[in-house]
Structure formats: C-alpha cells, structure tokens
C-alpha cells in the first residue's frame, strides 16, 4: 500500500515480554516500514528477529562492502545484518565439561581462564568477498608507501567492517585493532608541543619556554651542555697557552693568508652576530651561558626583560632608532653594528606595516571609550603585540639569511646554478608525502665544546686586525700583545661601565647621531660597503692576528677549566677518523713539528688549539666555500641543524598564522630569485636611497664584488646586476598642485619621461622604440602610427558594443547565488573589472588568451592580467626598491614569453593573408572587434614596421600600459560609490543606467565615473629634469629642481584643487571633461583616453543598472588598501601576503529575485 506504514510482528519472543495494544514492550521483533521510494524493499528498524525470519536491507552491501544510506535524501539510516545462527553440538559440549579435572589450581575453587587465540583458518570462515578487496587495498597502500590517504575510499571504515566480523578470540582481529589504534594515536603529538595564547606565541626575552614542558631548556642563565664525554687521560702538565699561540696559532708579518675564495668580511660579521647570539660566558661563573641557546637575534633584542625594555619605545611596537641591546658588539668592527642597525630599521618597517594592514583585526587600536587603567592596559597590549610579532618576522629574515645566503657560501653553493640548500626546517612526514624525519621544536642547549668551535679569529682581515689593535690600545692604553689575561676582564668591565645604559645614546666607529637619533646613512653605507670589499682571512694555523693573543690564551685556559674532550675524542664523537700522526692534523712540516713538541701524541692535542691548527680545506665547487679546518667544517653543520630544527619558533610555530600572512611573505625566500638568497631585503630596506635594486653589494655581500663578477659571469647572470659601489640617490621631487602638474607634463624640453629603463630591460631594443620610451621624433612618430590604427572609422561604435556585451557576459557568467538565492554575488574587480579589459586588449592586439571560445590560446584570463599588470608595474610603478629585483626578473621572463608568441602570431598574419592568427578562434558574425586585431597588425605593417617592431614596440607594451590602468580606475570609482562618502549617489546612477544610451545619458554616466576616479584615484607620473629649473606651485611655493632629479607629479591633490573643481568634495557629474587631469596632459597624455572613457561608461551602465548594488558583508566586500605618503594607496593581494599597486579583489552583490 503506497504511502502506508506497515508494522509486522510475530507475537512474543522467547523472553516472554508483555504485549500492550498489540505492541510488544522491549520485545525483539522485526518492524518493517514500506515507503513508495523504496518500492518493495524493507528496512529493518529493530535489531533482532526470530531465526526463522528472512528480510532484506537497503545499502548493507555496497560495492566496497559498506552499509550506507543517504539520510539527506529521505532514506533511513542503515543497520547491520542478521547474525548467522551458531551451530553447536550439545552432547559434545556436555562431554567436554564432564571430563574436566577438578579446579585445584586456584584457592577459590575456580577454573583458570585460558585465552586461546584462533588462527587464520577460523578467520577465513568469517571473511566475505569484499573483505578480500579491503585486505588487498591495505597491502597496496603499504607497498606504495602512501603517506596521505584518500578517505573517499572508506578504507578505514572497511577495515572496521572486516575486524568486526572476525571471531572474538581472533589473533588477526587483535593485530588489526592494535594497528588502527597506533595509527590514530600517532596522528597527534603526545604531549602536544603547540599551545594557544600570547605566552606561547611570542619569544620570551631570555629564551625560556621554547620547549613548553622543559621551559628552562636553553634559556639565558642556563648551564652549558657537554657534547662529548672525555675519557682519555690527559697529560699531567699541559703546554703554556701563550707558547701554544706563538707556536701554532699566531699570525706573523709574513704568514698572513687571505681567504682563498675571496669571501668578504661581511660573512664573518654575520658569524660574529650568530656567535654572540648563542654564547655569552658569565665571567663570574664560566659554566653559565648568559645568552639563550636559540638564534633569537638576542644581540638586537637582548637576553633579559631589562635589556629588551632598553631598546623599546613602548609605542606602536617600535624600537628606538639605530640601536641594539648587546653592549659587547660595540667593541667589534663597526660593520657588525651596522648590520644590527639594519635589523633595527627592518623591525620598525615591519611594525609599521603590521599596524597598517591589521590582518584580521589583530592589531586594532584601543577604543577611545576606554579610560584609566583599562585604556593604559589596552595600549600596552597593542604595543606589545606589534613589537613581538615584528620580532618574529624580523627574526624570520635573520634565519632565512643564515640558512640560505650564509650556508650557501659556507658550502660554495653560490658558485653553481642550483636551488638546493641545507634548510634544517624542511618538513617531513605523512602530510608532505615523505618518510618521517628528525623531530622538530624540541628545544636546544648549546655546549661548551661548540663555544670553542665558533672562535674563527683566523678569518679576521688585515683591516680588522688593525681595528682590534686600536681597540686594545684605547681600552688598556698599551698594545694588545702586552695585555695579560687578568687585565682583560677588568678592561672589558670598565668599557661596559663607560658605555651608556640607553642603547639610543650609544655610538660606534666614530659615527655621530643626528637630532632624530639616527646615524648618517652616508657613514653607515660607506662602512658596510668597505666591509663588502674587504677580503677576509683564511682558516688554519698561524693566521690569528697577534692582537688576539690574550683572547686566544684565555680560550685555551677556559677549555681546560671545562675539561672538554681532546681533538681526537671530539672527532670520533662525530664519526670522523681520529688523527694518528701530527702530519694528519696539518701537513705543514713546521706546524706538525710544533704540535709534536707541544703534545707528544695526537691524542693529547687539546680541542681548541687543535681546531685552530688543523689543516684547512681547499675550496670545492660545490662543497667547500669558506674553506674551514676539517673538523669545523663537519661539526658546525650539525650544530646549525640542531640550533634551527630544535627551535619551535623556526619550525612548528614558523607559520603565516603567527607571523601574519604579510609578515611571513615579507621575509620568505623564493628559490626562483637568486636561488633563494634574501640578504638584499635587509640592505635595500635599510638604505633605499643608496643601494640600487640590483646592486651586487646588496645581493651577494658575503663575497667581494670582483669575485662575484667572475661567479655571475660564469653563471650567465652578470647582466642582471650593478657592480658599482653604492652612492646616494637623491629622493624624488614632489609636485602636487594642478598648475605644477600641467607645467611639468607640458614642458617636454625640460622634463623627460623615465620609462625607457624599464622598457629596455623587459623588451630590449623593441621596448626602447615604444612611444612612451622617450621624447625623440621617433617616439612621436610611433604614437601617431598607433593612433591611426586604434581610431579608425567606426571605432566608437565597435568599442562601445564590445564593452557593453563583454561586461554583461562577465557579470552573468562570473556571478553566483549564495544563501537564499535572492542575491547575486561577484568579485567585481578580480573576475569582472580586470577581465573585461584583458578581453578587449586580446581581441584588439591578437593576444594569446585562452577561453572557452578560444581554447587554442596560451594564457588564461587571470594569467594574462597578471603578466600585463607586472609589465605596467615594472615600467611605470616600480616604487619599492626592496621588491624591485624579483619583480623585474620574473616580469622579464613572462614578458618575453608573451612577446615571442605575439611576434609569431604577427608573422603568421602578415605572411598568410587569409589567416586570423594563431590564437583566435572563428569569430561570431556580430562580434564588434572580430577583425580589429588582424586589421591593426596589417595596418602597422603597412607603415613599414617589421614583425618584431609590431610585437615588441607596439602590441605588448601598449597592452601592458592600457589594461591594468583602465582596470584600476574602474575599481577605484566603484569603491568610492560603495563607500559612505559616495553611496548616496548610487540611486541617481542607477536611474541613469536604466535609461537608454543617448549622448546625454552617456555623458552623465561618464561624469559620475570621472568624479569617482577624481575622488578615489591615486595617480601620478614621473619625469626626469633635463635642466636646472624652479617649479611654481599654485600655492606660491617654489620648488627648486636640479638637472638629473626625478620629479613626481601627483594628481591626488590636483584633483581636489578648488580653483579647477569648485566644491571639490561634492560629486558633480557635469564638470567639464577637459578639467580631469588623471589621464595626463602634454605630449605623453594617455593615447587611449577616448576609448577608456567609452569603456568605463558602459561598465558603469552595466553594473549600476542592477538593483541595490552594494558590498557583500564582511571583509570580502572591502577593497583592502594600505595608505602610502602623498594620499596614495597600495592594495593587499587576495591572500593578504603582499602588497600590489592595483586593486585586487572586492565582492559586491545585488538583488536578483
């Protein structure tokens, strides 16, 4: 009976439960339900039935043996199968029981219980056909070594089915259950190593709580660890430390050896920072390390709360300008201090941008409604959150430079074309599809032995040796060679007392601070540049400066007090062959003989003197870069791995969630740029007005420039870099008034365009011929030629029809319903505004765009926009020097790929008259621009241009100049009208957009669009002064300009000039069109202005004729932008991991019932 519910039972079950109103209470009966959906099938709703009852179940045997039902579609949940009756022989059971012996084993008179597990034979009786498939799937997964499992196969559930069917006493059942439990257990850490809350999110000043369950492991103030247990009995009388230095360590006037690989002093300055980061022996107790055992950039941030507080401003997360916490570094060569100041500036850059971006509201400023202690506490938290996250980010750059730039030089990877690097943070395990690797984030404790391993004084250059000698003379009043160990500590203590407690008041290198607390950039750049040019010393015996004698003798004494193992014991611990002869230690006869006289037997050689006196390795490409002594080259790599892999802030907690997406990307390395090297980020961010974006001094400072030139020439990369010493680059001259802008842009003989450099870099000779590349007659002729092809008869109607049709097509195809299906949503920038111009340029210029209608294209819509936006940015908007090099190198690669494809297409069209080109499908008959691209190419050819010139001097640069700019103005105008300042104009725009297109309505819509652009646009243009001049601004200010100055004309203030725009904050769609300056004026005014205005008119019409256009709720509806000086903005990328010069994403919605 369709639609009826039928209950069926067979009376009382064997338990004799009572029946009320025909329904048994708690009886084991079968209840069957019939629904039309299930036809003649029945579903078992209760668990058990009489053995004689037969029934079917839905979904109890699917193709993989699972019991499933789709409860979302009206089906009832599945149930299990009816168990098979167990056949037993009562007489056999009775006989077994009667023959049992009396239970005498236990005192309580019970029989012992014996658990006897069944074997495979019994298991096979319970296995079904699909269980065999499950077993095979398990074996296959094991053999393939699958780490990530496809849970759509339901393998885990199928195993559960199999195990559930096996007998209770089955051995395989127990084994499979154990295996399942182990896998589930191992999916999580035990105990967990990562916890929530600021106390676990930020580094503590002293390094404690790096390991949550051993919080003092590696904290400042901890004891040194011991790496190797000393077992060899040392001689009763050891040689005098001073004699050891004179015999095998000290440098003589004729024995100095410069570094064989021409490594610069910068590498050793970096090593100095690392060494002082993790080692600070307490002079009152040499067993105690006053530093933490982590590379937490303590020389900058300090090892205690007091030290950290001394460098903070306690405002907006910033540090005091140009300072660092650790006084010890002030006594080092001044280049070390310059590196720390560069990190100081980077920290403040990070703190500023974290606040501006404010990812996820993480750094919201406290409410003005708070008062008293609550207000004070809120601002304190705001400052501390910014400071601590900025520290994590800055330390991230520190460790990336260490693991990529520094380590690549250590093992000579900088001389080969490889992206491999020894990054101890490399993840391993199931989630990355590899075997499990070494543990991460387990903490660290540095040892006394490694304190001795990191004393690389042989590598001090001649220049820095003189500095050390002068420092000793200044501190002790006598030459370093005359200073005794007992005087050493007293002298350093006195120096520390004389050093200002406030890091912001300290000086170094004879440099002076300015009124703003900063050092002069010219001084710092000169200092660090000279260090880049300074070849360091070589590792090995008899190369330590004489000025370091007292330091080295104290090191030998300290090693003896620590009772560290000898050189051979140390080597054996690291599985290195012990030395059997002194000639094995060093083949130099003089050094070997001195060691023999000092120690008698190689086993007696002490660790520290042995490490210094060992023979140094010769450079190997790759493999040996800094050419250390043999033992050092092995053990420092082990220590580097432990230092980094044990630090949770560089492993398990080094994530975008902790550093923010932007912070993580800001310091991340890209193996496709400089093979991952990121030192340039620190240099150029600290000194943007001195280091060019491609300065070899900034990119590869750990090798001297002359050697870098040899390396880069051999790798075929020398053309990417500038090898000149850095020098001051004057900042741009800013012109902000309407009249000043007109004057600069119209006076071509005095102010020249600056775009030739970017165009030439991207497109070579072809780019230099582009109409915007210069001010010569050639460029003016190129402009006329392109204008003649763009603006042919009927172009207005064709452009208008195209944008009207394409805008509607994209709004329909890219939008979607969410929620109650009454509102359509779309990303108006990413999926519509940017794309419509991509389609226009592709049709007009024959670009290889891949679409559903044109599947033979090469680049998708988003890829094409990305390429064209990168081209525009490189040529016209390359404003951030620290981001310029990766931008330019990556853009050139994709730009040339595009240009070569375009050139091939141009050749085909010009060679075969009837060809539509390589990338164009058959056009629709009503397609407005169906033959525009082909006609343009042939027209340019008719003007005498070569196929190369058409592609490289016209098509590609024109497309790059047009698409992102036009997309930008639409996005900014729409954003304005969706903002509180402009949203009350939307009803007026909507009414105009609903009316038929006429000259009047078109002009009115264009007026609204132009007003939105005027009020929200961020436009400007660069020129270079050819002569000295004085520019008179509208407010009477006179701006002096020197020949060679870069002049930036800002349209932001000019667009609000009340002289030209009365009531400038009010939208007036009827203002004279010629007043709008953002398309430029003069000889280089935007050639596509007329087409652009037709385009934005139709785009406004198409969008705003929709009802109730508005932002979607939440941050997806906002155009995320970050303010820059002069009223400009940059925009967050979609993942908020970086900044972009053009709007990226903003979602809107409208009513569509």
From Swiss-Prot:
Changing residue 1086 to S: Fully supports the oxidation of linoleic acid (18:2n-6) by the DOX activity, but strongly impairs the production of the epoxy alcohol. Keywords: Dioxygenase, Heme, Iron, Metal-binding, Oxidoreductase, Peroxidase. Heme b binds at residues 276, 457. The keyword Heme applies. One of its GO terms (biological process) is fatty acid metabolic process. PANTHER family: LINOLEATE 10R-LIPOXYGENASE, PROSTAGLANDIN G/H SYNTHASE. Bifunctional dioxygenase (DOX)-epoxy alcohol synthase (EAS) that converts linoleic acid (18:2n-6) sequentially to 10(R)-hydroperoxy-8(E),12(Z)-octadecadienoic acid (10R-HPODE) and 10R-HPODE further to 12 S(13R)-epoxy-10(R)-hydroxy-8(E)-octadecenoic acid as the end product. The epoxy alcohol is formed from 10R-HPODE, likely by heterolytic cleavage of the dioxygen bond and subsequent intramolecular epoxidation of the 12(Z) double bond. This is Bifunctional dioxygenase (DOX)-epoxy alcohol synthase (EAS). It comes from Pyricularia oryzae (strain 70-15 / ATCC MYA-4617 / FGSC 8958).
């Amino acid at each position: 009976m369709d639609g009826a519910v039928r209950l069926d039972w067979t009376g009382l079950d064997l338990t004799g439960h009572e029946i009320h109103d025909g329904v048994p209470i708690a009886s084991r009966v079968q209840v069957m339900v019939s629904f039309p959906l299930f036809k003649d099938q029945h579903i078992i709703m209760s668990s058990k039935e009489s053995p004689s009852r037969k029934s079917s179940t839905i979904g109890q045997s699917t193709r993989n043996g699972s019991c499933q039902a789709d409860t979302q579609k009206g089906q009832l949940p599945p149930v299990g199968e009816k168990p098979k009756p167990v056949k037993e022989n009562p007489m056999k059971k009775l006989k077994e029981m009667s023959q049992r012996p009396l239970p005498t084993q236990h005192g309580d008179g019970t029989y012992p219980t014996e658990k006897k597990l069944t074997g495979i034979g019994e298991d096979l009786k319970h296995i079904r056909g699909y269980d065999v498939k499950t077993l095979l799937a398990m074996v296959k997964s094991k053999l393939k070594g699958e780490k990530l499992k496809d849970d759509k196969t339901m393998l885990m559930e199928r195993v559960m089915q199999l195990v559930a069917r096996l007998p209770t006493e089955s051995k395989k059942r127990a084994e499979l259950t154990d295996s399942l439990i182990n896998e589930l257990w191992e999916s999580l850490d035990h105990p967990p190593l990562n916890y929530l809350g600021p106390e676990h999110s930020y580094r503590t000043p002293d390094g404690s709580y790096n390991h949550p369950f051993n919080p003092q492991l590696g904290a400042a103030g901890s004891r040194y660890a011991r790496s190797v247990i000393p077992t060899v009995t040392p001689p009763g009388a050891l040689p005098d430390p001073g004699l050891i230095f004179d015999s095998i360590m000290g440098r003589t006037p004729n024995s100095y050896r410069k570094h064989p690989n021409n490594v610069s002093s910068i590498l050793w300055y970096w090593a100095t920072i690392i060494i002082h980061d993790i080692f600070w022996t307490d002079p009152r107790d040499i067993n105690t390390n006053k530093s933490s055992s982590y590379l937490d950039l303590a020389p900058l941030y300090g090892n205690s709360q007091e030290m950290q507080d001394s460098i903070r401003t306690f405002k907006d997360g910033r540090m005091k300008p140009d300072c660092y916490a650790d006084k010890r570094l002030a006594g080092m060569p001044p280049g070390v201090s310059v590196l720390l100041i560069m990190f100081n500036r980077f920290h403040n850059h990070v703190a500023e941008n974290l606040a501006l971006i404010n990812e996820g509201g993480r750094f919201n400023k406290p409410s003005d409604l708070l008062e008293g202690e609550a207000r004070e506490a809120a601002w304190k938290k705001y400052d501390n959150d910014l400071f601590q996250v900025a520290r994590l980010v800055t330390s991230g750059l520190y460790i990336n430079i260490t693991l990529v730039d520094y380590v690549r030089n250590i093992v000579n990877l900088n001389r080969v074309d490889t992206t491999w690097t020894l990054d101890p943070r490399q993840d391993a395990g199931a989630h990355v599809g590899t075997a499990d690797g070494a543990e991460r984030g387990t903490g660290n404790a540095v040892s006394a032995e490694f304190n001795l391993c990191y004393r690389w004084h042989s590598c001090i250059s001649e220049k820095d040796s003189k500095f050390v000698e002068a420092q000793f003379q200044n501190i002790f009043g006598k030459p370093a060679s005359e200073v005794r160990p007992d005087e050493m500590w007293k002298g350093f203590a006195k120096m520390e007392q004389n050093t200002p407690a406030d890091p912001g008041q300290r000086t170094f290198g004879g440099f002076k601070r300015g009124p703003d607390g900063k050092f002069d950039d010219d001084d710092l750049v000169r200092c660090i540049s000279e260090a880049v040019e300074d070849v360091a010393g070589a590792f090995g015996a008899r190369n330590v400066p004489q000025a370091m004698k007292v330091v080295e003798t104290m090191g030998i004494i300290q090693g003896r007090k620590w009772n560290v193992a000898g050189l051979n014991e140390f080597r054996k611990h690291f599985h290195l062959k012990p030395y059997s002869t002194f000639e094995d230690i060093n083949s130099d006869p003089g050094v070997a003989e001195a060691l023999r006289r000092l120690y008698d037997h190689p086993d007696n050689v002490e660790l520290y003197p042995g490490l210094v006196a060992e023979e140094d390795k010769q450079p190997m490409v790759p493999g040996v870069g800094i050419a250390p002594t043999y033992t050092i080259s092995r053990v420092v790599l082990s220590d580097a791995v432990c230092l980094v892999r044990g630090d949770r802030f560089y492993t398990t907690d080094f994530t975008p969630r902790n550093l923010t997406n932007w912070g993580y990307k800001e310091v991340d390395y890209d193996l496709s740029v400089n093979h991952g090297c990121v030192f340039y980020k620190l240099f150029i961010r600290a000194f943007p007005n001195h280091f060019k974006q491609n300065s070899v001094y900034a990119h590869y400072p750990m090798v001297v420039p002359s050697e870098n030139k040899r390396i880069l020439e051999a790798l075929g990369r020398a053309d990417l870099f500038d090898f000149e010493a850095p020098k001051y680059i004057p900042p741009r001259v800013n012109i902000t008034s309407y009249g000043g802008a007109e004057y600069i842009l119209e006076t071509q003989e005095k102010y020249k365009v600056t775009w030739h450099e970017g165009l030439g870099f991207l497109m070579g000779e072809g780019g230099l011929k582009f109409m915007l590349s210069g001010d010569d007659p050639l460029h003016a002729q190129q402009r006329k030629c392109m204008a003649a092809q763009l603006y042919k008869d009927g172009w207005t109607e064709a452009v208008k029809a195209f944008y009207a049709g394409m805008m509607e097509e994209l709004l329909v195809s890219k939008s979607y319903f969410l929620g109650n299906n009454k509102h359509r949503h779309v990303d108006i920038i990413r999926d519509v505004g940017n794309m419509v111009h991509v389609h226009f340029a592709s049709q007009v210029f024959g670009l290889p765009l891949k679409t559903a209608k044109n599947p033979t294209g090469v680049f998708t819509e988003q890829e094409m926009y990305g390429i064209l936006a990168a081209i525009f940015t490189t040529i016209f908007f390359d404003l951030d020097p620290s981001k310029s090099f990766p931008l330019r190198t990556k853009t050139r690669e994709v730009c040339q790929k595009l240009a070569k494809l375009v050139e091939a297409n141009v050749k085909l069209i010009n060679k075969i008259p009837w060809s539509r080109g390589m990338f164009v499908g058959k056009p629709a008959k009503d397609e407005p621009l169906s033959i525009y691209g082909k006609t343009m190419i042939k027209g340019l050819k008719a003007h005498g241009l070569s196929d190369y010139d058409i592609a490289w001097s016209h098509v590609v640069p024109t497309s790059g100049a047009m698409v992102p700019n036009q997309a930008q103005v639409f996005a900014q105008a729409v954003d304005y009208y969706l903002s509180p300042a402009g949203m009350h104009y939307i009803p007026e725009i909507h009414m105009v957009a609903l009316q038929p297109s006429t000259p009047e309505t078109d002009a009115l819509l264009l007026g609204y669009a132009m007003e939105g652009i005027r009020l929200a646009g961020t436009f400007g243009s660069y020129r270079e002064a050819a002569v000295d001049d004085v520019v008179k601004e509208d407010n009477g200010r006179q701006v002096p300009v020197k020949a060679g100055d870069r002049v930036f004309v800002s349209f932001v203030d000019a667009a609000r000039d009340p002289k030209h725009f009365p009531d400038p904050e009010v939208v007036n769609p009827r203002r004279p069109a010629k007043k709008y300056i953002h398309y430029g004026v003069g000889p280089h005014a935007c050639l596509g202005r007329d087409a652009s205005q037709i385009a934005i008119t139709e785009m406004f019409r198409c969008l705003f004729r929709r009802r109730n256009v508005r932002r979607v709720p939440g941050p997806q509806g906002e155009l995320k932008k970050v303010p820059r000086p002069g009223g400009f903005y940059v925009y967050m990328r979609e993942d908020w991991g970086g900044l972009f010069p053009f709007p990226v994403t903003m979602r809107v919605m409208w009513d569509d019932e």
